[in-house]
Amino acid sequence: MGFKGVGTYEIVPYQAPSLNLNAWEGKLEPGAVVRTYTRGDKPSDNAKWQVALVAGSGDSAEYLIINVHSGYFLTATKENHIVSTPQISPTDPSARWTIKPATTHQYEVFTINNKVSELGQLTVKDYSTHSGADVLSASAKTADNQKWYFDAK
């Protein structure tokens, strides 16, 4: 499970590999909050994310992370707050992310950092390993709850 650039992925928390990043309740209107959800044999479209390169390359590449079900962008709305999928311009910096390797114990995992540095990294709240945990944009510490697997779909 590694990030290979643009493509469609199930994004999985390192500290809870039985869960995935999920646009909660599969809503088609803007603003769905993002939480963890139990992985199944075949992920639903609200648990799949299209990663699209929008600027830069290599370590400075910026990506939009687009929910396959709704078409809305993963967005950090404010620091230490749950991320969501609002209707927002693709040029808005809060909808842009960098993805960096953070290999841990020989596992190929990554951090997902918001372009707005004050908005930090994609983070599972309180290191939760339970379905329904909020996914935040929190201060970047590259902790285990801020590392992710990318499972190509």
UniProtKB/Swiss-Prot annotation:
Annotated positions binding beta-D-galactosyl-(1->3)-N-acetyl-D-galactosamine: 22-25, 46
Keywords for this protein: Lectin
Top-level taxon of the source organism: Eukaryota
SUPFAM superfamilies for the chain: Ricin B-like lectins (SSF50370)
Ricin B-type lectin domain residues: 58-153
Pfam families, per the entry: RicinB_lectin_2
Zinc-finger found in the keyword field: no
GO terms of molecular function: carbohydrate binding
This protein's record includes keyword rRNA-binding: no
InterPro entries for this protein: Ricin_B-like_lectins, Ricin_B_lectin
Signal peptide: none
Function field: Lectin that primarily recognizes glycans with a non-reducing terminal N-acetylgalactosamine (GalNAc), with a preference for the alpha- over the beta-anomer. Can also bind non-reducing terminal galactose (Gal) residues but with a lower affinity. Strongly interacts with glycolipid type glycans with terminal non-reducing Gal or GalNAc but fails to bind sialylated or fucosylated forms of the same glycans. Strongly interacts with galactosylated N-glycans, displaying highest affinity for alpha-1-3 branched mono-antennary N-glycans but also binding to multi-antennary glycans.
Subunit and interaction comment: Homodimer.
Name listed for the protein in its UniProt record: Agglutinin
Species per Swiss-Prot/TrEMBL record: Sclerotinia sclerotiorum (White mold)
Origin organism lineage: Eukaryota, Fungi, Dikarya, Ascomycota, Pezizomycotina
